[in-house]
Amino acid sequence: MNVRASLPAKSPAASGRRATLHALVAAAIAGALPLAAVAQAVTLLTGRPSGVHHPLGVALGTALRKSLPSFKPSVKGTKGTAESLEELQQGRAEIAFSLGDTLSDAWKGREDAGFRTPLDRLRSIGALFPNYIQVVARADAGIRTLAGLRGKHVSVGVLKSGIELDARAIFSAAGLRYASFGRIEYLPFGESVELMKNRQLDATLQSALLGVSGLRDLATSVDIVVIPVPAEVLRKIDTDVYLPAVIPANTYRGQTKDVPTVAVQNVLVTHEGVPDDTVYAVTKTLWTSIGELTGAHPAAKAMDPTKALAGLVIPLHPGAERYYRETGVLK
């Protein structure tokens, strides 16, 4: 049965109301109408309230309210990125923050990442800033390379979490399997750090901003080594998701040289059902409010509109595409 054909057609009145609403939003954005002439409810999903995305979502909501008083943004926390993306797919929100690796898994419907079917209604608004994959070992464990992890006691993050899936990809590309390690742990980052402090764990990894507090704290307690993720490893993994990156010298105590690694983008996401004019307005407000976002969290210092398309793993929403064409980011 053709499900699409069997759906009831929209009434002329409903279609007319929708067209009128879109026209009002477009006119308000263009300045042809008072911004109060149309009201738009916009729900922003920010993941866990303790995470980086939550203060940025609050700041973006405030910026939307200021620049477009007709918008009625609300910020909602979720259990994490996966839940946020599922909510978007179902049309229960308009905007969400995500990491590029999780977004790629959602788009593909990767079952071992917790997605039973592809979330094919998702669309990108733009790449915000990178998370760096940071592999660290206790200096006295004698580990200097990924190969040196063989036979060691390693924590790879919570099973099936984003970082654990990153660990699988990176270690596999380096010729390592979990069976290669002397002992494997599936622990949250905080617990892994505490075990390393107590010399009960040799190494761990995290996907985080540079200078993440947990690693700074670890480096003040024990001597650490930041393990390189070399270019040949990057070439063997999904280069649509992972980007070449560098952890600059002196990011952590005792780290005297730049260390190559890979990074994944933080991405602002919407879904195909959100009107083009709404997404255009959100995209414009996002990139003209970097100062306000930086005030909410220093991660926004790395935001650069000229890099908004780097590392995107799903299609752009047409409303975002329009903004990038107008500003010359997209030719």
Regions found by a protein language model. Name each.
Residues 55-59, 65-88, 254-256:
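Extracytoplasmic small-molecule ligand-binding "clamshell" domains
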Residues 100, 111, 141, 177-269, ...:
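Pocket-lining segment of extracytoplasmic ligand-binding domains
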Residues 6-27:
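N-terminal secretory signal peptides and thylakoid transit peptides that target proteins
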Residues 152-169, 241-312:
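Ligand-binding clefts/hinges and TM-proximal coupling segments of bilobed small-molecule sensing domains
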Residues 114-128, 133, 251-260:
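A structural signal for short loop-to-beta-strand junctions that line the ligand-binding cleft
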Residues 187-191, 197-199, 208-226, 232, ...:
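An extracytoplasmic/periplasmic, membrane-proximal ligand-sensing/linker region
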